[in-house]
A protein has these predicted regions:
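Acyl-donor (CoA/ACP) binding surface of acyl/acetyltransferases
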Residues: 101-121
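Conserved acetyl-CoA-binding loop-helix of GNAT-fold acetyltransferases
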Residues: 46-59
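Conserved GNAT acetyl-CoA-binding A-motif
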Residues: 57-72
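A short, internal acetyl-CoA/4′-phosphopantetheine-binding micro-motif in the GNAT/acyltransferase core
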Residues: 35-46
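Conserved catalytic-core motifs of GNAT/GCN5-like acyltransferases
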Residues: 83-100, 107-110
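Conserved short alpha-helix immediately C-terminal to the canonical SAM/SAH-binding motif I
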Residues: 53, 72-76
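Acetyl-CoA-dependent GNAT
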Residues: 1-33
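Conserved active-site tyrosine of GNAT-family acetyltransferases
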Residues: 76-78, 82
């Protein structure tokens, strides 16, 4: 599986709506449409930008996963039916780490049509 680190202030970040005028942070985009958000700082607090960004990613078909979210972020994630899980992310952590994502259901999209082609993941 190929992963690409994407930061705000890059063309890849802008293509995902993760723009430097709204956020500071970084994520990893995998070629299987998993999107791991490791760090996000909103430049304009309480304006709904993080919520809108997550909504966009879900709508675009990404399997959005938030690593070690803050309490405020957890509140946002509950509204999108995210749940706490644990994953092993050996590139960044020695042990399993808290990752919030939506539980798969038979009715959930399988992310096969994600727009990963919009972003160079190689």
């Amino acid at each position: 599986m190929t992963k690409k680190r994407i930061e705000t202030g890059t063309s890849e970040g802008d293509a995902l709506g993760f723009s430097a005028d709204l956020f500071s942070g970084w994520l990893e985009l995998c070629d299987d449409c998993r999107l791991y958000l490791y760090c996000i700082i909103s430049r304009h607090r309480n304006e709904g930008n993080a919520r809108n960004l997550i909504r966009r990613w879900i709508s675009d078909g990404y399997d959005v996963r938030i690593v070690k979210p803050s309490v405020i972020m957890q509140h946002i994630l509950h509204k999108f039916s995210f749940e706490q899980f644990h994953e092993y992310l050996p590139d960044h952590y020695d042990d399993e780490v808290e990752v919030w994502r939506r539980r798969f259901t038979p009715y959930a999209p399988k992310y096969i049509s994600c727009p990963a082609g919009r972003v160079d993941t190689a």
